[in-house]
Curated annotation (Swiss-Prot):
GO terms for biological process: rRNA base methylation; tRNA methylation. One of its GO terms (molecular function) is metal ion binding. It is found in: Cytoplasm. HAMAP family: RNA_methyltr_RlmN. It comes from Prosthecochloris aestuarii (strain DSM 271 / SK 413). Residues 104-339 form the Radical SAM core domain. It is an enzyme of class 2 (transferase). This is Probable dual-specificity RNA methyltransferase RlmN.
Length: 359
């Protein structure tokens, strides 16, 4: 007996090729894609705009996997100033990822995961200590947003307005699937469509993939997990920086901003006595003056058995003042969901964290 294939593994282009290979007109692919990602059919026989014979062929050869989550897999932040919610999203192969809803300032932002685990092992990030299992496909990325929208509909709290690819994993290691998922989520003819201007992709700074992203035609925002403008310090925090040093990252970001005309966001987590001195701030000033950018400062979010501390208010204020006095565009991002391990760097599923880790 032939094993059924996952129809959601096919990109939009691959669906066109599939339809042509079985003698169907090319437009059938568009109909099928709409049923999958706008109407969100759970069975081929629901696809009434497609001929019965094609529905039967698809049902015989393919299956329609569904991601899922339940109310019991939702954790709410109980702090007075946050309504962040963290969801456990079950994938069809029994793997799972965490997805976060951040309602704030009139927006509903969804933070999506792109990998089960992460292979990059950033020292301040819980996900890296999970190890790495696999990339998500485009459907699994998009369905995280669909499921959160279902949740918002159920509680009467509006629509998803923004998406950040800042959950579990390194998005640019799954670049093809990420690009395909952005296409699904931003299709203006679909039921749920988010402007690409309200979608942000994050990366530790994978240089070849940043170049590919610049040429992809997407108009999404790009955030760089920087965390230090000193090469030695950055490499000690983020092993990937050894392969992609700051000197080369700077050149790539100059080219990226020149090609796209869009600023990048430099994300900088302030860590006590590691990257929070005035000298560190001045190094960041010199780097940031090289290309069009804005700087997003964030506090360290505690992780069990990882011995970092947040910079104190005095050191943080001196750091901020140094950047502002240099004329840089600086925002201080409020962490949402730290009390439920849903903030930046805290996402991890049922994996043992290290007994002790420090720089």
């Amino acid at each position: 007996m032939t094993t059924k294939q996952n129809i959601k593994r096919y990109s939009r282009k691959e669906l066109e090729e599939l339809m042509q290979s079985i003698g169907e007109p090319r437009f059938r692919a568009a109909q099928l894609h709409r049923w999958l990602y706008s109407d969100r059919a759970s069975d081929f026989h629901e696809m009434t705009t497609i001929s019965k014979s094609l529905r039967e062929t698809l049902d015989r050869k393919y299956f329609l996997p569904q991601c899922s989550m339940s109310s019991t897999q939702c954790v709410e932040d109980s702090s007075a100033d946050s309504t962040t919610r963290k969801f456990l999203v079950q994938l069809h192969d029994q793997e799972a990822v965490e997805t976060v809803l951040i309602p704030a300032e009139g927006r509903n932002t969804v933070c999506v995961s792109t990998q089960v685990g992460c292979p990059l092992h950033c020292s301040f990030c819980a996900t890296g200590y999970m190890g790495f299992t696999r990339n998500l496909n485009a459907a699994e990325i998009a369905e995280q947003v669909f499921l959160v929208q279902d949740y918002l509909d159920a509680i009467g709290c509006g629509a998803v307005t923004n998406i950040v690819y800042m959950g579990m994993g390194e998005p640019l290691l799954a670049l093809e699937e990420v690009i395909e998922s952005v296409g699904i989520l931003s299709d203006t003819t679909y039921r749920l469509h988010i402007s690409q201007k309200k979608i942000t992709l994050s990366t530790v700074g994978l240089l070849p993939e940043i170049g590919m992203l610049a040429r992809s035609g997407l108009t999404t925002n790009l955030a760089i997990s920087l965390h230090s403008a000193d090469q030695e310090t950055r490499a000690s925090l983020m092993p990937s920086a050894r392969d992609y040093p700051l000197k080369e990252l700077r050149k790539t970001l100059i080219q990226y901003t020149s090609e796209t005309g869009q600023p990048v966001t430099l994300v900088y987590m302030l860590l006590k006595e590691i990257n929070d001195t005035q000298e560190d701030a001045l190094k960041l000033v010199r780097l940031a003056r090289s290309f069009l950018c804005k700087i997003n400062l964030i506090d360290y979010n505690p992780i069990v058995n990882i011995k970092f501390d947040s910079a104190g208010e005095q050191r943080k204020n001196i750091f901020i003042r140094t950047l502002v006095d240099a004329g840089l565009n600086v925002t201080v991002r409020k962490s949402h969901g730290s009390s439920i391990n849903a903030a930046c760097g805290q996402l991890a599923i049922n994996k043992k964290l290290p007994e002790s880790s420090t720089l």
